[in-house]
């Protein structure tokens, strides 16, 4: 059984085939909060471009939903293969998939069809687990093979899943005449983990895709996707916004911030003034305006970031909503908050419930009227889109 206090970090990086605007690989991940499960799916549609993307999207969506419903591996594969539309040119339907189901008790189940084998690492060493082969017997899919395995993960374990655009990269080149292959990919990952034992899922996945692109002389011959699942110590963050409803609770809020183990963000001038006063610390204001839409940040001993309140948090909502792997975050206050949120796993929001009369102006957007609404939108995005552990408390 997996140790308590282990966070499951999931990230996928992708690069399109050279000259293609749409990726034919699709990655989906969902947290089944009520069951404490995380389900991850990577699918590679036949061909390239729009057709491949449609096949992969259909496959990944079905696989994700069926896995959430605890359907058997053979049944999942059977339904997917029978449902995919037939290609008008090749007269066949085809899409690969890898499904990883991480249960709350720690057991991991992997289901694969025609994707490169999922690589599992314990620290910087490959972990060998027994795989089962299921041969399908239905008339339409007779002879097709599905591979499954289960294992109990430990802290610092990693799983690396990819499409064949990674393992076949470099094919025909002097360095890799038969492609990079599982052996080359495994050696590369061992080197990366050895150099940086706490390398994040995002960074490792990004480096794998970058190397595959390099293998193909920066002209990828196929869509390349790599997803990494990393079991590690959670990174904690506290975000406080708004003064307490009762002034008598000011000291309680300040003590909460001072005693928190992890990164700390304060959003709101009144809130930061209260905490600085209660802790006897000085706030230093910056006069740089990297984002013309927002007031500049401030700093205080023991706090990682201090920003203005509602306007900044509203922009955080917009950035998180539109965020994807191609977005480059700037240096503005909202961008800095998003960066800290992305780098954290367990995020605790403390929302003060005293009404700030400045935000009751009817000319302001409705979303600015109640900070609780804005914070709840941030929390929902963090949970659903970024698989973060989020808690809210009101004071």
Regions found by a protein language model. Name each.
Residues 107, 259-264:
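Short active-site oxyanion
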Residues 167-255, 259-261, 281-395:
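C-terminal catalytic subdomain
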Residues 26-81, 160, 171-187:
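Primarily the active-site beta-strand->alpha-helix module of PP2C/PPM metal-dependent phosphatases
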Residues 20-35, 131-172:
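Acidic loop->beta-strand submotif enriched in PP2C/PPM serine/threonine phosphatases
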Residues 100, 105-110, 115-120, 127-158, ...:
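His/Asp/Glu-rich metal-coordinating catalytic cores
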Residues 55-124, 146, 199-229:
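Catalytic core of PPM/PP2C metal-dependent serine/threonine phosphatase domains
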Residues 1-23:
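Regulatory cytosolic signal-relay segments
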Residues 36-48, 112-113, 151-175, 229, ...:
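Conserved beta-strand-loop-short alpha-helix elements that form
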């Amino acid at each position: 059984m997996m140790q308590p206090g282990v966070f499951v970090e999931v990230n996928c990086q992708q690069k399109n085939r050279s000259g293609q605007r749409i990726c034919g690989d699709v990655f989906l991940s969902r947290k089944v909060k009520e069951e404490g499960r995380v389900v991850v799916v990577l699918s590679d549609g036949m061909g390239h471009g729009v057709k491949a993307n449609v096949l992969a999207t259909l496959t990944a969506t079905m696989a994700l939903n069926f896995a959430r419903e605890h359907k058997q591996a053979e049944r999942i594969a059977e339904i997917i293969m029978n449902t995919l539309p037939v290609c008008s040119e090749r007269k066949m339907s085809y899409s690969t998939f890898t499904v990883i189901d991480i249960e709350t008790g720690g057991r991991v189940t992997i289901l694969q069809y025609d994707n490169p084998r999922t690589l599992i690492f314990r620290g910087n060493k490959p972990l060998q687990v027994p795989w089962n082969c299921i041969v399908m017997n239905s008339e339409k899919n007779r002879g097709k093979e599905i591979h499954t395995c289960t294992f109990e993960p430990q802290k610092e374990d990693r799983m690396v899943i990819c499409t064949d655009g990674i393992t076949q990269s470099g094919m025909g080149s002097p360095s890799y005449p038969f492609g990079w292959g599982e052996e080359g990919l495994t050696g590369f990952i061992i080197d990366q983990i050895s150099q940086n034992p706490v390398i994040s899922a995002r960074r490792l996945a990004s480096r794998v895709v970058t190397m595959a692109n390099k293998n193909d002389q920066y002209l990828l011959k196929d869509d390349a996707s790599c997803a990494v699942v990393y079991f590690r110590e959670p990174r904690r963050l506290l975000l406080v916004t708004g003064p307490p409803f009762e002034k008598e609770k000011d000291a309680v809020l300040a003590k909460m911030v001072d005693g928190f183990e992890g990164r700390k963000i304060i959003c709101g001038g009144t809130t930061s003034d209260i905490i600085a006063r209660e802790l006897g610390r000085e706030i230093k204001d910056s006069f740089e305006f990297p984002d013309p839409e927002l007031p500049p940040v401030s700093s205080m001993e023991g706090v990682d970031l201090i920003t203005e309140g509602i306007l900044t948090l509203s922009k955080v909502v917009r950035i998180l909503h539109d965020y994807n792997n191609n977005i480059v975050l700037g240096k503005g206050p909202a961008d800095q908050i998003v960066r800290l949120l992305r780098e954290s796993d367990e995020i605790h929001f403390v929302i003060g419930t005293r009404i700030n009369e400045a935000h009751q102006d009817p000319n302001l957007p409705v979303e600015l009227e109640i900070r609780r609404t804005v914070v709840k939108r941030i929390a929902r995005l963090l949970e659903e889109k970024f698989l973060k552990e989020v808690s809210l408390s009101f004071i």
